[in-house]
């Protein structure tokens, strides 16, 4: 296969990956986006094997074995992992990309001739720089993603873990990583390579553990970006333009998404990375006097909903925890049969990963044309008879609009309080990730529905 044909095929794969990203940006075209991505990846793999065929039968066996293991594992995951576990699954996949970057860099260090980058002890300087950057980014991505996976899957506390003098430790470790990159690029020291890898592994842990569970959408986007740049680093080491293109696409899209997520929380990217914000708060904000709230039953809610003309449902992380999306869809179907107009309002940072609520609603087969983003539906709350909030706390807090002293002041929120009646399904009056009371709880037009979100929604369905 000629180099020109390979370049053309890699370009075609890159275009398909761009189309995949475009398709995955909307639920209506997500299946098409997945198909584009699959075809692009197939072209890239076949082209690579044809241009650099394994040297012997044993090498072919390893390639086939690797493909079989990867394909079968992917198939099992696709069939068995529930949609509610998508955030931790995404984090786990990011970790694999990071570790792949580390292993490829290690392979290039010990067998440079196989990568056509020189010989042992005489590797090209440019390749050493690429390898050092690849292993640093890859190692940070791996351990950072593992910590994110543990937090998201509740195998580790989602609250921030604050170490004494953590900023000084991180600065010192970052400086050591930079120094090791320079030293390795100048000396090709194997010891420096592994010290760099372990320093980056530690750095990945230290920058993620102080980040609270509710900041995970930004973390997932950030790790997505890291994994892309790690893949691009692998591409440079392997001399594979398709991998460079793909890595750059993932890296840049992840960075853009991180910016969008930060904007949606009215936070700076640096403030998220510095951590210490986003911890789970077990009870009402400390020092706050308990205020009376209106509490309703499932029967009360069903009566009001049934007689409403327009209902806007606002899902949040509480829906994901309770896995209430199917019950919510059933409730919406019952209301539509009664002639009620039903819409869903999604905040960009609701949940624990970008698009978390969209994924869960799609799993419950909620029609795409009923789901709206914040900017598209905020103006409709004033015309809604009922806003049904299910586990969306800080993203519905009026303090973001009305209280300049609030930590979340200026954060874009869903203006649910403008609806005729607000129904808030929640276990208790506990604070959200910002650690502040939601003043929505105490408004005259708010009715609290205490209890498990799924059970409460199912009881409302029965009452309907």
Regions from the PLM with identified roles:
Residues 14-18, 36-48, 62, 66-70, ...:
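Alpha-helical transmembrane segments in multi-pass membrane proteins
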Residues 48-64, 76-85, 102-120:
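Transmembrane alpha-helix boundary signature
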Residues 16-29, 71-90, 145-160, 203-216, ...:
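C-terminal ends of transmembrane helices
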Residues 249-308:
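Membrane-interfacial segments at transmembrane helix termini in multi-pass membrane proteins
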Residues 107-121, 186-191, 218, 225-245:
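Transmembrane helix-loop junctions at the membrane interface of multipass transporters and ion channels
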Residues 1-14, 54-72, 127-142, 188-199:
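Structural signature of hydrophobic alpha-helical transmembrane segments
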């Amino acid at each position: 296969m000629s180099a020109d044909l390979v370049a053309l095929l890699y370009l075609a794969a890159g275009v398909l990956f761009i189309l995949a990203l475009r398709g995955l940006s909307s639920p209506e075209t997500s299946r098409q986006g997945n198909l584009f991505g699959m075809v692009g990846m197939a072209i890239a793999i076949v082209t690579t094997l044809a241009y650099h065929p394994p040297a012997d039968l044993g090498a072919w066996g390893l390639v086939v074995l690797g493909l079989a293991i990867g394909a079968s594992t992917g198939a099992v995951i696709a069939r068995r992992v529930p949609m509610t576990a998508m955030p931790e699954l995404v984090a786990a996949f990011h970790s694999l990309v990071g570790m792949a970057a580390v292993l490829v860099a290690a392979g290039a260090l010990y067998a440079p001739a196989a990568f056509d980058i020189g010989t042992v002890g005489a590797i090209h300087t440019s390749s050493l720089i690429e390898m050092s950057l690849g292993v640093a980014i890859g190692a940070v991505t791996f351990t950072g993603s593992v910590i994110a996976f543990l937090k998201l899957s509740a195998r580790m506390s989602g609250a921030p873990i604050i170490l004494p003098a953590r900023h000084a430790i991180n600065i010192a470790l970052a400086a050591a990583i930079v120094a090791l990159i320079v030293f390795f690029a100048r000396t090709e020291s194997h010891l420096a390579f592994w010290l760099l890898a372990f320093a980056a592994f530690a750095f990945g842990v230290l920058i993620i553990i102080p980040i609270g569970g509710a900041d995970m959408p930004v973390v997932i986007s950030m790790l997505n970006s890291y994994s892309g740049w790690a893949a691009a680093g692998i591409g440079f080491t392997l001399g594979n333009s398709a991998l460079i293109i793909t890595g750059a696409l993932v890296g840049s899209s992840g960075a853009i998404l991180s910016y969008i997520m930060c904007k949606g929380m009215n936070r700076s990217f640096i403030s998220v990375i510095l951590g210490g914000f986003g911890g789970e708060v077990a009870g009402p904000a400390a020092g706050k006097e308990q205020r009376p709230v209106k509490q309703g039953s499932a029967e009360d809610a069903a009566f009001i909903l049934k007689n409403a003309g327009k209902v806007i449902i606002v899902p949040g992380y509480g829906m994901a925890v309770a896995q209430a999306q199917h019950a919510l869809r059933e409730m919406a179907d019952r209301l539509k049969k009664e002639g009620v107009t039903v819409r869903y309002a999604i905040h960009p940072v609701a949940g624990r990963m970008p698009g978390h609520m969209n994924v869960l609603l799609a799993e419950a087969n909620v029609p795409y044309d009923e789901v709206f983003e914040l900017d598209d539906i905020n103006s409709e709350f004033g015309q809604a008879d009922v806003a049904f909030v299910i586990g969306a706390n800080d993203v519905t807090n009026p303090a973001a609009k009305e209280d300049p002293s609030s930590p979340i002041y200026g954060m874009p929120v869903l203006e649910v309080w403008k609806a005729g009646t607000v129904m808030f399904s929640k276990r208790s009056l506990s604070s959200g990730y910002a650690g502040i009371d939601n003043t929505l709880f105490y408004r005259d037009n708010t009715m609290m529905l205490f209890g498990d979100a799924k059970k409460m929604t199912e009881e409302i369905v029965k009452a309907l």
